[in-house]
């Protein structure tokens, strides 16, 4: 009876290596699931922003006694529409891929890293050039004979400003995604190992 009681008292205090490995594996799976869910949501946010900016700009046109203007009249705004459409499509596709449980391989990490970087610069360029056009439309520039048009087409400029602001928010999301994909890629590489030079040490001792 004493042995059995001692045995019962010791058993809960000790855990087998297999049990420890199983618990750590479950914890890793929970962490991976949480990270996968967070990344999926982070990739869906710029998709929604891109669609919103695209729709606002597509519907942006105004007519009055002075004439009519549409987003298609300006190359910068056409670029903004195309860039938001491409980025929204990529965000949806990458979110679907990120949501699927699969091992993170080196080719996959490189693909996400490169595409996230490219799309970040694409959407940033669209937002920047559209901002310049909006500035000229508001302030004008006599040096290039560009007159201020927002006083005449205030509604058009207002919608264009909304689309550009939404695009800049999408740029922030893509910048965060670029950091995440960079981290996932470069953590797969081993840290450099410093090998001490025995020749130098020997020279120092003999000197």
Curated annotation (Swiss-Prot):
Key word Lipid biosynthesis present: no
Parts of the chain that traverse the membrane: 38-58, 80-100, 109-129, 160-180
Gene Ontology cellular-component annotations: plasma membrane
UniProt lineage: Eukaryota, Viridiplantae, Streptophyta, Embryophyta, Tracheophyta
Extracellular compartment residues: 59-79, 130-159
Subunit structure, as described in the record: Homodimer and heterodimers.
Subcellular location: Cell membrane
Protein name: CASP-like protein F16
Sequence ranges on the Cytoplasmic membrane side: 1-37, 101-108, 181-207
InterPro entries: CASP/CASPL, CASP_dom
Record keywords, A-Z: Cell membrane, Membrane, Transmembrane, Transmembrane helix
Membrane topology term: Multi-pass membrane protein
Keyword Transmembrane annotated: yes
Family: Belongs to the Casparian strip membrane proteins (CASP) family.
UniProt-annotated stretches for the region Disordered: 1-30
Biological process, per Gene Ontology: seed trichome differentiation
């Amino acid at each position: 009876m004493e042995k059995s009681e001692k045995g019962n008292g010791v058993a809960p205090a000790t855990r087998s290596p297999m049990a420890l490995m199983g618990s750590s594996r479950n914890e890793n799976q929970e962490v991976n699931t949480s990270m996968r869910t967070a990344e999926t949501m982070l990739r869906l946010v710029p998709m929604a922003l891109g669609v919103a900016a695209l729709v606002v700009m597509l519907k942006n046109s105004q007519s009055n006694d002075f004439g009519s203007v549409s987003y298609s009249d300006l190359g910068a705004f056409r670029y903004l529409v195309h860039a938001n459409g491409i980025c929204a499509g990529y965000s949806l596709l990458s979110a679907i891929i990120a949501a699927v449980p699969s091992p993170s391989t080196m080719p996959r990490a490189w693909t996400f890293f490169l595409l996230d970087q490219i799309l970040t610069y694409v959407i940033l360029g669209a937002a920047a050039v559209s901002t310049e056009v909006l500035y000229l439309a508001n302030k004008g520039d006599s040096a290039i004979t560009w007159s201020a048009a927002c006083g005449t087409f205030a509604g058009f400029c207002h919608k264009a400003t909304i689309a550009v602001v939404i695009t800049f928010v999408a740029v922030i999301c893509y910048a965060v995604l670029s950091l995440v994909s960079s981290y996932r890629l470069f953590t797969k590489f081993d840290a450099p190992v410093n090998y001490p030079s025995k020749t130098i040490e020997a020279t120092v001792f003999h000197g």
